[in-house]
């Protein structure tokens, strides 16, 4: 019986501790991936190439040219960290670097999916990142949130898990309101939430949450799901996927779906 396919996306803020790669966090991620692979086919979308490169070459990360250079230095460092952590579980790692045009071309998308299918059939972990070395300011996915959504839909998964530095999607800005509450289940996203100005380094209201909502909206329109939770609280993910218990986080799912039960 074929396992359900899921995509796990982790942001750079959860992979670095200050200016160094957080090996403890990567080991924890490797452990939960090994557990998830007992029940699911897992694809990992990982940010962190630029941040990893910056641990070796301390140059300004805000210019496009420097960002591309740092990504070319950091990507092999990032992959080596994953390879080292996952070898204890006998899980081979594979690298795929993608850009927007890979999804504009049916041919490229098919080739990439065929490669992923083959890797999963042999228990390997496909690790996907945006190809920052050749990406431009006009053609970026946004901290890989939208890349994760595209990978989920085009490569045959039904659930995207985004591990972030927030606990979920709140009913109001938790940095401004002490009574802000996590919304456990969301079936639709208001258009005004998607139209906010966003930047990768903004605050909660105008920063990374917006790209996550755009990713969720993309998937909801295609009858797929997304789960948003904190990347440093992996027991939440473990409870959700392995014990059918939602202790925190937000599940974005179509109103007519049975949620996570469709995968378990």
From Swiss-Prot:
MF term (GO), any: glutamate 5-kinase activity
Known EC number: 2.7.2.11
Protein localization: Cytoplasm
Predominant location: cytoplasm
Name of this protein: Glutamate 5-kinase
Record Pfam families: AA_kinase
Entry binding sites for ATP: 9, 164-165, 206-212
């Amino acid at each position: 019986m074929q396992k359900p396919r899921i995509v796990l996306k982790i942001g750079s803020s959860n992979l670095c501790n200050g200016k160094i790669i957080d090996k403890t966090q990567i080991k924890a991620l490797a452990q939960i991936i090994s557990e998830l692979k007992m029940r699911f086919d897992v694809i990992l979308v990982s940010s962190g190439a630029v941040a990893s490169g910056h641990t070796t070459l301390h140059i300004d990360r805000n210019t496009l040219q420097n960002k591309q250079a740092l990504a070319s230095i950091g990507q092999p460092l990032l992959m080596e960290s994953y390879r080292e952590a996952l070898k204890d579980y006998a899980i081979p790692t594979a690298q795929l670097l993608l850009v927007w045009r890979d999804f504009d071309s049916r041919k490229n998308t098919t080739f990439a999916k065929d490669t992923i299918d083959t890797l999963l059939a042999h228990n390997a972990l496909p690790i996907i990142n945006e190809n920052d070395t050749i990406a431009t300011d006009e053609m970026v996915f946004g901290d890989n949130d939208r890349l994760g959504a595209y990978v989920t839909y085009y490569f045959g998964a039904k659930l995207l898990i985004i591990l972030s530095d927030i606990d979920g999607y709140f009913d109001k800005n938790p940095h401004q309101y002490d009574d802000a509450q996590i919304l456990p289940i969301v079936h639709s996203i208001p258009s005004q939430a998607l139209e906010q100005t966003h930047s990768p380094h903004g605050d909660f209201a105008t920063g990374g949450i917006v790209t996550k909502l755009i990713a969720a909206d993309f998937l909801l329109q295609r009858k797929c799901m997304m789960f948003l939770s904190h990347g440093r609280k992996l027991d939440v993910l473990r409870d959700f996927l392995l014990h059918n218990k939602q202790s925190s986080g937000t599940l974005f799912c179509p109103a007519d779906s049975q949620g996570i039960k469709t995968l378990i």
